[in-house]
UniProtKB/Swiss-Prot annotation:
Native source species: Bos taurus
Quaternary context: Interacts with PKA type I regulatory subunits PRKAR1A and PRKAR1B. Also binds to type II regulatory subunits, but at a tenfold lower affinity.
Protein name: Small membrane A-kinase anchor protein
Organism domain of life: Eukaryota
UniProt record similarity statement: Belongs to the small membrane AKAP family.
PKA-RI-binding: region residues: 56-74
Location(s) in or outside the cell: Cell membrane
An example Gene Ontology molecular-function term: protein kinase A regulatory subunit binding
Lipidation (N-myristoyl glycine): 2
Regions that span the bilayer: none
GO cellular component: plasma membrane
Lipid linkage positions (S-palmitoyl cysteine): 3
InterPro entries named among the record's database cross-references: Small_membr_AKAP
Modification after translation, per record: May be palmitoylated at Cys-3.
């Protein structure tokens, strides 16, 4: 009888199908896509814009919050390190 999974069709395209698809796609693709693009010689000036007020407040809050989280994490790690520093690390050889 066999397994039902083995009788189902493979959901992904085979290599032959993908090769046929690429051949047909090349006919419809313009030649411009294959040519390297040359940057234009127009002078582009980048302007540095100051972020508006609310964005500065949000940035400062996020910076403060990330520093607080990092500080708490380091304190927690230090506490656990002191608590368990005298227990030797034992490597296991099996699961």
């Amino acid at each position: 009888m066999g397994c039902m999974k083995s009788k189902q069709t493979f959901p992904f395209p085979t290599t032959l199908e993908s090769e046929k698809r690429h051949v047909s796609e090349e006919n419809f693709m313009p030649e411009e896509k294959f040519l390297p693009r040359i940057p234009s010689l127009v002078n582009v000036k980048e302007e540095v814009k100051e972020p508006p007020g609310p964005q500065i407040v949000v940035f400062e809050f996020a910076q403060h919050l990330s520093q607080e989280i990092l500080s708490d994490a380091l304190q927690q790690w230090a506490g656990n390190n002191l608590k368990y520093y005298d227990i030797p690390y034992i490597e296991s050889e099996g699961p």
